[in-house]
Amino acid sequence: MKKIKISVIGSTGYAGKELVKILMNHQKVELVHLVSSSYAGKNIAEIFPEFLNKLDKKLINFNLDVVSQDSDLVFTALPHTVSMDMVPELLKKGVKVVDLSADYRIKDFAVYQEWYKKELNQISKELLLEAVYGLPEIYLDKIKDALLVANPGCYPTSVILGIAPLLKHHFVEPVGIIIDSKSGISGAGRKLSLGLHFAECNENFKAYKVVRHNHIPEVEQELSSVYFGADNKEQIKGIKVSFTPHLLPINRGILSTCYLSLRGSKKEEEVLEIYQKYYHKAPFVRIFEPPNLPEIKYAVGTNYCDIGFTIDERVGKIKVISAIDNLLKGAAGQAVQNMNIMSGFPETCGLV
């Protein structure tokens, strides 16, 4: 059986490590190069002892010619604004890319500059429009033919999947949407930070970036596209959301609670039906029937997005609860799901 050759750039971050764990056991993948500027020259098992006797692979510095020549597809799991200088060169060499940063998620380069504070060259502006947003449950057909996939953020994945069916079917008002999300500490990455020290996080629960989180424009862009249609000029006005992230004293997992105003009276059976129909071909979405609701512990360690809801008739609201593993469906698992689709493999290959 012929395998596709894969390299991972940024293989020693949390998402990069999860990619390696999945890919080393993927039956259709040959893991060629693991790139890490911080640990080049060391064996990955020296950095993560869990790979001892499982994977014998030396970490290397990035070399465009070496990586592109040996790879069919490359994952870039790098900090935001870093991938944008590297991805165009890989694409020029004929290599497909799944980028886990935010660098190619935002279609409007002015919005990208506003939120990420990076100037764009002309090539990058063009790639913003060419990149496919890698949410398979919505963009499956586009991902199949994509050369560059922008892997969604963790919070946006939980939110967009959670409420897309309601917006698509106009069951809710596109205004006044409130999103309350909680994430485990790994969502902040491996970099050192006082606020992420054990003594700061343990036995604590706090909100952060309560007005301006970088995932807001991504969520608004995709919800607007779902509601108004990708080609509808009305989406320029756009859906606005009030988003508040929180940090949980756990390693991984996200739980999002979204509050939306119903358009008229809706029964649970009606809402359940649109969710089941919308995701009936989505292998990694699990719909909970009321009164059951998702919990983080059900989703952690899987590539599933679990979705449940409750209708508060007294105030005319629907509350949607979704849960994912931020490092899997929110990062590495979804990236491999996209790789599978781009390569013509079953979506679930290597993930179940």
Language-model region placement:
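Short Gly/Pro-enriched turn/cap motifs at secondary-structure boundaries
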Residues: 207-211, 248-249, 296-299
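Short, solvent-exposed polar/charged micro-motifs at secondary-structure junctions
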Residues: 42-44, 70-71, 188-189, 251-255, ...
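C-terminal active-site/capping subdomain that shapes the small-molecule cofactor and substrate pocket
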Residues: 256-352
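N-terminal Rossmann-like NAD(P) cofactor-binding subdomain of oxidoreductases
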Residues: 1-204, 208-210, 231-236, 310-313
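C-terminal substrate-binding/catalytic lobe of Rossmann-fold NAD(P)-dependent dehydrogenases
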Residues: 211-289
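Conserved active-site and cofactor/substrate-binding residues in soluble primary-metabolism enzymes
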Residues: 14, 130, 154-161, 210-218, ...
